[in-house]
Amino acid sequence: MGQQVLVNGHQMKVYVEGNDPETIVLLSGAGIASPILDFKEVSESLSKRYKVVIVERVGYGYSDDSNYSRDVMEVLSETRQALSQANVKGPFIISSHSTASLESLAWQKKYPDEVKALIGLDWVLPSSYEDLKENQTLFTVAYWSSKIGLLRYFPESFYIKNPTLTENELEQYKLLAYKQLIPQAILHESRLVKENAKKVPSSINPILILSFL
């Protein structure tokens, strides 16, 4: 499913569906098991009119985990490198979910010629993080519980029930959910989210933006 590309010494998965020259890049929010499988129904529907591309960040889905910085500009750099290596060319319509709004806004600010439009799916805007109360102890406990296999005793709590997945895909999803529940990359994402929000501009260049809750 998709292709593996090497970025900064880590394997990243890039999934492409559809042949239209108009390209939508789907960016997932934090903490899901596999963006490719989670967005399956969306990508299948959109691929009838667009080329749909899903990049699984390190720590997600079929991609490797990573202990590298999760600074928003580093994450953006990895996404752009993965697209380049998969021979996916812009400009792009970028559809981002939840916390991935930070990456898409940073992308539009730094590389405006690559961004044709932004689509926000339940966006978390930079200002939303100002009063965020972080609970790193909870994340750390969950991380180590995942590492020692404790969370395997509660499988139904840690993956999204997706009726569009085949039995084989559902089994893959469960395995990925166990493997990637709280990887290092997601732990580092949680620690840097407030700092990343400060690096994203509160105002952006004029562009078509659609937001859905």
Regions found by a protein language model. Name each.
Residues 1-5:
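N-terminal membrane-anchoring alpha-helices
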Residues 7-17:
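A short loop-to-beta-strand scaffold at the N-terminal edge of the catalytic core in hydrolase folds
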Residues 16-62:
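Conserved HGGG/HGGXW glycine-rich cap/lid loop of the alpha/beta-hydrolase fold
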Residues 36-38, 63-69, 130:
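Conserved catalytic-core motifs of eukaryotic protein kinase domains, centered on the activation segment
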Residues 54-95, 111:
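Active-site loop/oxyanion-hole signature of alpha/beta-hydrolase fold enzymes
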Residues 90-132:
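Conserved hydrolase catalytic core segment
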Residues 124-152:
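A catalytic-pocket lid/entrance helix-loop region that shapes and gates access to the active site
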Residues 165-213:
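Conserved serine/cysteine hydrolase catalytic core
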